[in-house]
Regions:
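Canonical tetratricopeptide repeat
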Residues: 48, 80-83, 87, 120, ...
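Short helix-capping/linker turns of helical repeat alpha-solenoids
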Residues: 80, 113, 145-146, 177-178, ...
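Alpha-helical segment of the N-proximal tetratricopeptide repeat
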Residues: 42-72, 83, 87-94, 123, ...
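Register position in tetratricopeptide repeats
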Residues: 55, 90, 94, 127-128, ...
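C-terminal motif of bacterial Sec signal peptides marking the signal peptidase cleavage site
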Residues: 29-32
Length: 296
């Protein structure tokens, strides 16, 4: 299942979240073709294609790919369709179409109630600074979440700023051996302003088996940079970059360049920027910074 951090891509208010965002296409799109194994394979292929397009910043093409995948659903909305729809909403969010992303979520909820989609729409409402609507959706998601799903419950309480219940759920999850809970504990303490403790939790999480939240490296590195521990920050960034594009690669690469500049290692910063611009040629701010680096 998707992670809403993708959606938010860490724009911060929605950043997680919205990593990259996801949502189901409009109900009108859920029409047409049979649900054969072949069509499922086509849906999976289009989903993979759309994710790759979104990761490269081509959100228009990503939305088209997700739409094509949803058109193969034959009026059936299962976990795959919900996942694809969520990715569509995320792409719409990154296009700057916040209202359209919300509409995409609403269309799916008209067809099938889903805790994940209520969560996604709630994050979108929060980004639109409609906290009342966001909390209503978080509450709906909470009501549809199993009592055993301590991580989901903890996240929902966290988004609702009910930190007492959030801490309780996440602590219990961690006691049960769920490393994912450590990441969300770190998020909670970071947003609460206790960055020292949050960073220790992020590092605990990253030292575990197969950490999946790439943005945790970004958090730790930003803290190390603020402490002027540049070599430590570079080591952290390199570990995050080694994951490939999991939603935070662009930010990690940008931070890496900034650290080399702070170290006054302008030749390396320039070389890193050249590589960065090959991947993200439309980044106007980076292009201007490159002109500065060429003069050093």
């Amino acid at each position: 299942m998707y992670d809403e951090s993708i959606i938010l891509a860490r724009g911060k208010s929605m950043n997680k979240a919205v990593k990259w965002l996801v949502v189901v296409g409009c109900a009108v799109m859920l029409c047409g073709c049979g649900n054969s194994e072949n069509r499922k394979e086509q849906q999976q292929s289009l989903r993979t294609q759309g994710i790759a397009q979104a990761q490269s910043g081509d959100y228009d093409s990503a939305v088209q790919s997700f739409d094509q995948a949803l058109k193969l659903s034959d009026m059936q909305v299962g976990s795959l369709e919900l996942d694809i729809a969520a990715y569509k909403a995320a792409a719409e969010y990154h296009q700057g179409n916040l209202d359209q992303a919300i509409d995409t979520c609403s269309a799916i909820l008209d067809v099938k109630k889903s805790a994940e989609i209520y969560l996604t729409r709630g994050l979108l409402y929060r980004d639109a600074e409609n906290q009342e609507a966001a909390n209503a959706d978080f509450t709906e998601a909470l009501n549809r979440t199993s009592k055993k799903d301590l991580i989901m419950k903890g996240r929902l309480y966290y988004y609702m700023k009910d930190y007492t219940n959030a801490k309780s759920c996440l602590e219990e999850a961690v006691k049960n051996g769920d490393q994912e809970g450590v990441y969300w504990q770190a998020e909670l303490y970071w947003d609460s302003g206790n960055q020292d403790y949050a960073v220790s939790l992020y590092q605990n999480y990253l030292s575990g088996e197969s950490p999946s939240h790439q943005d945790a490296y970004e958090r730790v590195a930003s803290y190390q940079i603020s402490q002027e521990k540049y070599d430590d920050a570079l080591a952290t960034l390199e570990q995050g970059i080694a994951m490939g594009d999991q939603g935070s690669l662009r930010s990690l690469l940008s931070s890496e360049i900034a650290v080399y500049e702070r170290k006054s290692d302008f030749p390396t910063a320039k070389a890193k920027m050249e590589s960065y611009l090959e991947s993200y040629p439309d980044d106007a701010d980076a292009a201007r910074e490159y002109e500065f680096l060429k003069s050093r």
